[in-house]
Amino acid sequence: MAKLYFRYSAMDAGKTLDLLKVAYNYEDRGRKPLVLTSAIDKRAGLNKVKSRIGINQDAYSLTDRDNIFEFVENYNSSNKIDCVLIDEIHFFTQEQVWQLAEIVDELNIPVICYGLRTNYLGQPFETAALLLAIADTLEEVKTICHCGKKASFNMMVQNGKAIKQGNPIVVDDDSLKEIDTKYVSVCRKHWKEGVYE
């Protein structure tokens, strides 16, 4: 029986790397995964997912206006798929999360979502909150803070200072480097204190 999975973490924990590993394992066994990502995240270019260590794979980039259920149903009618893997789920909508549940329930295809639980303001992404409520299986992908504790928060650092206000969605791409901005995964204590190294 198919399930809806949510694998979440702070940034730099290896979510995309895990997605690529799962896709490889399916393909290595003669199965067909369908890899989807958000068109908002253009770090690897459109129609591609790429881990921070450089491994990449072709994918379909979807917008928040796309009906994922219809996309998967149409794709599956001509290319039998065994699993749907979604990177950057936090950039999708709650309606699309319900469409993913429909893929599991109506098409009996497992769906594995990878994404952030919270933004750099410490607030949950709406899609993450919904997935935490409705996913059949929740799995935390763990990483560590500079202090050695588990990192569960994302901190935006600009010109050496922690940022705690602004647009909740800022994509980590090359444009941030131009304004000396980066994201750092930290524990709750260091997120509250604004300490990132």
From Swiss-Prot:
Its EC number is 2.7.1.21. GO terms for biological process: DNA biosynthetic process; thymidine metabolic process. The active site is at 88 (proton acceptor). SUPFAM superfamilies: Glucocorticoid receptor-like (DNA-binding domain), P-loop containing nucleoside triphosphate hydrolases. Keywords: ATP-binding, Cytoplasm, DNA synthesis, Kinase, Metal-binding, Nucleotide-binding, Transferase, Zinc. Belongs to the thymidine kinase family. HAMAP family: Thymidine_kinase (MF_00124). This is Thymidine kinase. It comes from Francisella tularensis subsp. tularensis (strain SCHU S4 / Schu 4). The gene is tdk.
